[in-house]
């Protein structure tokens, strides 16, 4: 029995399911999860002293690679002055100014401690600003585990086959409307049916929680037009895509201006940070300047702010362009070696994120199509790659992530392993 196996046995006795977030449990692929001891650059190292090329990147934040020296130095320096004050600090201002400089639609920014807090707060703000109760989201889009948003969701909820969670009252869930991703007609139909009742549309501009599904041409622009025509707000959930699809997020990549944006993952440099922001007109409705209440003891934590600022500063350099080039090389390489081994594979990628689907279909563009892919084949592929030292997301419904630390050799080694794995399916 490996040390990871032993630790998982201990964990299950004291932690529900042995993990503190369901996707980590390997339920989506079978077997016991790896317990990680350390990480450096593009590699993670488990407690059994095995190394892996990592394409999970802590589920997105590690865009610079693990244990980045500038982030580590910033955290160590900040710790010298204390861990948390519960009072304003200058670093919060500097961090917010940096976010605004990269994402101009965020004229004002409120820091929180997680992506779930960011989306939950943005939804409350949209409801308070418009005076409407209903919100519209998309099947397979995941926006955190708050009650309003855990309806027909993606990510770990989809992996576990529970896209809508018990514990959410029907009277509450009825205010969450769901449409089909990449289908504007389904959106328009709901706005017609619930005229003047919908506060906002919230959408992952690239759906990274039902694997990696790209918006079809005109989809995001169509959502903007529908919101404008109905006096509803458009919220782009960029917790995953922010600073990863492009330095200015998916909104820069696809040239779309939202009313509100939510951020997480990359913004914290590995620390627990989230943020939401938008036009000053809307953000002025947040307490203490407005009536919509939102608060958090550790919001704007100075250690997290220093880590996040170091991460964004390091990203804001010419080398950032290499991220998309590395991702394209990996994605097209996977497509090529799969074809060489006669394995049907669909590939999607944008910026520094990618996804692949075992399917005969040329394109996967919504929740139904993602669920129709060969999940059993993915499970086999996952373990064949893991045995060769390649760590992929342990679920067919999660996107993969590259970092600037991944070398050309890392990618070549990954493709060599993938070719062998495809040949064994």
From Swiss-Prot:
<dbReference type="GO" id="GO:0030170">
    <property type="term" value="F:pyridoxal phosphate binding"/>
</dbReference>
<keyword id="KW-0413">Isomerase</keyword>
<dbReference type="InterPro" id="IPR015424">
    <property type="entry name" value="PyrdxlP-dep_Trfase"/>
</dbReference>
<comment type="similarity">
    <text>Belongs to the class-III pyridoxal-phosphate-dependent aminotransferase family. HemL subfamily.</text>
</comment>
<dbReference type="Pfam" id="PF00202">
    <property type="entry name" value="Aminotran_3"/>
</dbReference>
<dbReference type="GO" id="GO:0042286">
    <property type="term" value="F:glutamate-1-semialdehyde 2,1-aminomutase activity"/>
</dbReference>
<keyword id="KW-0627">Porphyrin biosynthesis</keyword>
<dbReference type="InterPro" id="IPR004639">
    <property type="entry name" value="4pyrrol_synth_GluAld_NH2Trfase"/>
</dbReference>
<protein>
    <recommendedName>
        <fullName>Glutamate-1-semialdehyde 2,1-aminomutase</fullName>
        <ecNumber>5.4.3.8</ecNumber>
    </recommendedName>
</protein>
<keyword id="KW-0963">Cytoplasm</keyword>
<comment type="pathway">
    <text>Porphyrin-containing compound metabolism; protoporphyrin-IX biosynthesis; 5-aminolevulinate from L-glutamyl-tRNA(Glu): step 2/2.</text>
</comment>
<feature type="modified residue" description="N6-(pyridoxal phosphate)lysine">
    <location>
        <position position="265"/>
    </location>
</feature>
<dbReference type="InterPro" id="IPR049704">
    <property type="entry name" value="Aminotrans_3_PPA_site"/>
</dbReference>
<dbReference type="InterPro" id="IPR005814">
    <property type="entry name" value="Aminotrans_3"/>
</dbReference>
<dbReference type="GO" id="GO:0005737">
    <property type="term" value="C:cytoplasm"/>
</dbReference>
<dbReference type="GO" id="GO:0006782">
    <property type="term" value="P:protoporphyrinogen IX biosynthetic process"/>
</dbReference>
<dbReference type="InterPro" id="IPR015421">
    <property type="entry name" value="PyrdxlP-dep_Trfase_major"/>
</dbReference>
<keyword id="KW-0663">Pyridoxal phosphate</keyword>
<dbReference type="InterPro" id="IPR015422">
    <property type="entry name" value="PyrdxlP-dep_Trfase_small"/>
</dbReference>
<dbReference type="GO" id="GO:0008483">
    <property type="term" value="F:transaminase activity"/>
</dbReference>
<comment type="subunit">
    <text>Homodimer.</text>
</comment>
